[in-house]
Amino acid sequence: MSKKEININNYNDDAIQVLEGLDAVRKRPGMYIGSTDGAGLHHLVWEIVDNAVDEALSGFGDRIDVTINKDGSLTVQDHGRGMPTGMHAMGIPTVEVIFTILHAGGKFGQGGYKTSGGLHGVGSSVVNALSSWLEVEITRDGAVYKQRFENGGKPVTTLKKIGTAPKSKTGTKVTFMPDATIFSTTDFKYNTISERLNESAFLLKNVTLSLTDKRTNEAIEFHYENGVQDFVSYLNEDKEILTPVLYFEGEDNGFQVEVALQYNDGFSDNILSFVNNVRTKDGGTHETGLKSAITKVMNDYARKTGLLKEKDKNLEGSDYREGLAAVLSILVPEEHLQFEGQTKDKLGSPLARPVVDGIVADKLTFFLMENGELASNLIRKAIKARDAREAARKARDESRNGKKNKKDKGLLSGKLTPAQSKNPAKNELYLVEGDSAGGSAKQGRDRKFQAILPLRGKVVNTAKAKMADILKNEEINTMIYTIGAGVGADFSIEDANYDKIIIMTDADTDGAHIQTLLLTFFYRYMRPLVEAGHVYIALPPLYKMSKGKGKKEEVAYAWTDGELEELRKQFGKGATLQRYKGLGEMNADQLWETTMNPETRTLIRVTIEDLARAERRVNVLMGDKVEPRRKWIEDNVKFTLEETTVF
């Protein structure tokens, strides 16, 4: 993809515009970074990295280095033009404006970026506000400058020249220490950062991104010569491949478009879309353009070649996307950039759809005409997908009609114990392993808003099965009907009967397996539930410690071995320890107190921070290939003596 060159002289102090002050960032950090947990902590990293990415995206710098330092701080070094070092119109150094004024950045003037995801200043000031200290070092115009901020963004030094450098050497280095009084954790995760940098490297063809962890001496570099083509190969790494990677690129109205496509033998699609290197997880007009182009071109080809007869209806888009892995990356000029809502999760720029549609349609049409046998195989695969879809819809409709004809008291063959409330915004559905635990849960629940659905039979592995076979599985079918929002392409989150879907299983390998099967189903066929944060895992205690009898009995619970050791010290000698092997060992009161009471329970919310990472993880753990799964288990699972039986 061609890059729009921007004159280095135009990126100066006048290019930084100020929109508003930095007030309230420390008071309401969630408004700026989403949360103050681990996700919010790493959002600070993304803000600074995105600034460096923008420089590389605009053609300045071919390397970005991230370092987790021994003291827990983090450094991002780019080799771009270097932030402006002169005085701003406000009467203070421009660097100080960038790091202390909210929404001061290069995006808003004409001399900064033509396309941009993050911006020097826009995120920098937020990172500074939420750090106990921050240092910025700038190499530019043959000199090296440095400034330090402390206590949430207050400058403690002015911008000083601290040395010289060759005029050819430029860049910005930012080091910051997150404020432990704001974040629940300040522990940067090597794997989380490395996977995000890997994704960015795919989108920045021939730019090297590195991560070094000085705490553990781990280090890794990412560099991809083929960009999004390599990205698609990465997504399909553990799958059976049906086609080579198809790559299309083009430019129209200032929009630059790159698309890579490849088909595998799976039954679901995986489309990742990006705007100015920022992931648009909810898609948008650019993704709509891609999908419409594929559907239109494939149907036209099927008609011309006679694979679809006159009497046949056109295939649906979902038929052509079965088994498709695709990466769409577009660069949108600032004057056309428009997102829906406050986040950058969905592109709203109207012009993006016809631009992407036109480029992809032209290139895909040519490819199909040049590769007739492969094209025909893809059409036949889509026809099979249509047949499976129609069979699945018929089975689903029959299932729904059969359930609706039953009396309320016989609902779901007596499986579901419904909540009294009819308010979906408050109701919770517990998916409980086994009848015995289901019985305790029914007795212990708050019947006003908690519904119980025991899972008695085997849950099918939905990563391997066709939709028609999935709907034959009684447990899956019951869940679909209970949740009430459809499944797959027909899923509508607005119709869901519950605000929280809570998976509650035993704390053993069987329980973990059931969790994995259920999460795979939700990920594949009810993904909006997961993306919107409606799926949870209950966390029952592992231990119960008691001492005394009758009214004098003391009881406490431990969820980890560390908590157990604390209880041992607290209770001293004479205490009784019970290790829970299953939910059924707890009576109704204990289950309510430890696992179901909103005031005292602990729930794990299931989220998708990185879709590419999630897709690969599901493929490895639930797919057909044994060797990648064995390797992942060997690398990531520690087997202890507690899990080993010695005879």
UniProtKB/Swiss-Prot annotation:
GO CC annotations on file: chromosome
Secretion signal span: none
Task of the protein: Topoisomerase IV is essential for chromosome segregation. It relaxes supercoiled DNA. Performs the decatenation events required during the replication of a circular DNA molecule.
Positions contributing to Mg(2+) 1 binding: 433, 506
Descriptive protein name: DNA topoisomerase 4 subunit B
Activity regulation note: Inhibited by quinolones, such as levofloxacin.
Source organism of this protein record: Streptococcus pneumoniae serotype 4 (strain ATCC BAA-334 / TIGR4)
Binding site for Mg(2+) 2: 506, 508
Taxonomic lineage from the root: Bacteria, Bacillati, Bacillota, Bacilli, Lactobacillales
Gene name of the encoded protein: parE
